[in-house]
């Protein structure tokens, strides 16, 4: 859906939620948007800037650590009334693991790094396209689940599609 590149400070977080607000249908009281994140307070500050609090469910998964090793997690409701069993960040953690496995600049403690934010954004756009339109789980891509396409695409489909539009 969206990503933001940079140090995880308030400006970067605001940029992320602004993109989400632009790319999604604005939620309503009866059709709320759900957010689940880790315990960073920047998320708590950014969400109300771009979404009406009455239209949001927001929960946090906070990892309990000892010496950088996760020993447990606990969940908390921050905004709205999201059910505890729906508060999860597994998809984000899985996507981050996928990034680290495929791109050297995302590996922790690496010598290989991207020198410019633009390069990281470009790499993330490619990875996001691959994730959303090409890779499938149970014969469905995320784009198919959202009704954006009816079939699994290939890079050939993406790069060689003839686009038509009026100027």
Which residue ranges define each predicted feature?
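Residue-level recognition of single "structural anchor" positions
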Residues: 1-167
């Amino acid at each position: 859906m969206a990503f933001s590149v940079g140090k995880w400070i308030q400006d970067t977080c605001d940029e992320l939620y602004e993109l989400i607000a632009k790319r999604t249908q604005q939620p309503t009281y009866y059709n709320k948007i759900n957010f689940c994140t880790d315990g960073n307070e920047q998320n708590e500050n950014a969400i109300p800037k771009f979404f009406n609090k009455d239209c949001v469910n927001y929960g946090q998964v906070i990892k309990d650590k000892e010496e950088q090793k996760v020993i447990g997690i606990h969940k908390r409701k921050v905004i709205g009334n999201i059910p505890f069993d729906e508060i999860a960040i597994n998809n984000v953690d899985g996507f981050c693991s996928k990034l680290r496995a495929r791109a050297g600049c995302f590996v922790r403690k690496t010598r290989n790094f991207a020198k410019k934010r633009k390069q990281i954004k470009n790499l993330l756009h490619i990875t996001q396209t691959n994730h959303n339109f090409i890779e499938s789980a149970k014969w469905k891509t995320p784009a198919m689940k959202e009704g954006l396409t009816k079939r699994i695409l290939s890079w050939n489909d993406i790069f060689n599609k003839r686009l038509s539009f009026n100027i």
